[in-house]
Swiss-Prot record:
Designated name of the protein: UvrABC system protein C
Record-level Gene Ontology MF annotations: DNA binding; excinuclease ABC activity
Family, similarity comment: Belongs to the UvrC family.
CDD domains per record: GIY-YIG_UvrC_Cho
InterPro entries reported in the protein's UniProt record: GIY-YIG_endonuc, GIY-YIG_endonuc_sf, GIY-YIG_UvrC_Cho, Hlx-hairpin-Hlx_DNA-bd_motif, RuvA_2-like, UVR_dom, UVR_dom_sf, UvrABC_protein_C
Location (main, coarse): cytoplasm
Cell compartment(s), UniProt: Cytoplasm
Domain of life where this protein originates: Bacteria
GO biological process: nucleotide-excision repair; SOS response
Subunit (UniProt): Interacts with UvrB in an incision complex.
SUPFAM superfamilies: C-terminal UvrC-binding domain of UvrB, GIY-YIG endonuclease, RuvA domain 2-like
Keywords: Cytoplasm, DNA damage, DNA excision, DNA repair, Excision nuclease, SOS response
Amino acid sequence: MNAADLGNTIISAEDSTLEWDRAGTETAATGVEVIQAVVKRLPNAPGVYRMVNTEGDVLYVGKARSLKKRVTNYAQGRGHSNRIERMIRETATMEFVVTRTETEALLLEANLIKRLRPRFNVLMRDDKSFPYILLTGNHPAPGIFKHRGARSRRGDYFGPFASAGAVGRTINSLQRAFLLRTCTDSVFESRTRPCLLYQIKRCSGPCTREISVEDYATLVKEAKDFLSGRSSTVKAEIATAMQEASQALDFERAAIYRDRLAALSHVQSHQGINPQGLEEADVFAIHQEGGQTCIQVFFFRTGQNWGNRAYFPKADPALGHGEVLGSFLAQFYDDKPCPRLILLSHPVEDQDLLAEALSARAGRKVQVSVPARGEKKDLTDHALQNAREALGRRLAETSSQARLLEGLAETFGLEAAPRRIEVYDNSHIMGTNAVGAMIVAGPEGFVKNQYRKFNIRSAEITPGDDFGMMREVMQRRFARLIKEQGLPGNGSEAEDSDASFPAWPDLILIDGGQGQMSAVRQILDDLGIADLVTAIGVAKGVDRDAGRERFFMEGRPPFTLPPRDPVLYFVQRLRDEAHRFAIGSHRARRKKEMVKNPLDEIAGIGPGRKRALLHHFGTAKAVSRAAVEDLMEVGGISESIARLIYNHFHESG
């Protein structure tokens, strides 16, 4: 049973044969009474438990070797930290599931924490997917590509890389070394002569048979071997081939091998610190300071440093290095492949259990260790130094951000420094492909996982009507917010320091003047929340020069700020970020419209048939010229579908 299966077998206390006592959460004693009632019915077996409040929100997810013994600790009612006391006080009911082993419990716990994001657990933040290198496996001439997201495409994946830039640089060097194609399948099928990449020796030209199928397959195998960690073997084979070509006086071929070797050396030398004898490992280091935590991760694959990334998990300051790092690791590898070796700067709780769980997930042995000396210790020390520096920068930025937010509150007459600021902007060209954008900022800077874009879709909006677009954006944003979160102050958002990032904004900034503000105010009035949200319009001066902005607020005449006011610079940064995001979203939508395939307009042609047609004919234009009989030669295209396609392209003729 894997974590995904376990995640679907959660036993609710109300749905099981046990009758769970429900109690209020007004006092700490009430919470203890609920837990004491649950303990009587818990088995002495491994499993996972969930603590739930009166609203049905999961407060905490925990695992246990023995559910009964673990939950009994909460029933004592005394001797707990403030965090645990608050959690117990809010607990209205508990749910549990029994697992076969403690390893399964650990995997399930990590799965549930990532999915449910309980307020009292250690939580990963900024968990963007990592980019990988993909060698496609469903084509006679596999290509090499950058890939991010679900691994739905057949092929071999290599990574993770810390950034898209690292992937791009590596692919660029691998093109020089292995001459693999990077074109799409449709472009590959439509080529009649080699492209520029062939001319500059970045591709071997399999599209026009400039290389045999067998020789290209050899290049693909060498690339796989290199990316799989057998770089020394690959380089030795190429060096041998270069020597043989040189001895045969085939100096042109020897020069090709020489250039390939140089490209491989560039891949390995360009990645910074590259330890000897460490083919595949992840290095984690944790540093805690000022109530915050930084975990620095370095990725080593094929003996190369593929980059690093800093994480700042949400954790109770009272928790130690081991507990935070252990919880982080379980969540980190919940949806990522594990390397064979994981090096840590600090020991973690249940380290052997963690290694066992990761081994079970990977299907092979995964070693988790804290090196005490040697080159591996140097790696963890290097990662720890990076963690210290990253957290130092973050603390400095947070302090500066806090001062700016306090200044913002004073300037605009807010009751307190805003915890959540939303900034709105629109982008379009003559009303086409109109997009509304919302960016979010808070005490820790921009919160990019909260950004939202709104494709303007109302048929009643006149093209170019910025006020109408803003009304639609406001209506959709706040109507949905009310539906999902309720009104602010009704208890839907936790009020203690462990609360997650607030859903309701304390302040909204609109890129526009009085007209935009009137549109926004109309929607807020219609929804009955005009008194709950402070809205400010930010308009550029007559000459649209930065520094001459005019501000519009309800109940105040338009006003300006001194040119060198730090709050003015801060507002400009917020507005510019919203503008950047709006323009980027608009360009993406416009690009999507521009590359829209004519086959998308034919009813009955889904992704599978579209892919088969393009693979057979190469381009949509070639499909449009094909006869019915030619179309029927494509797998999955019946006579009726072939006539449908033919008629679509010839109906006006």
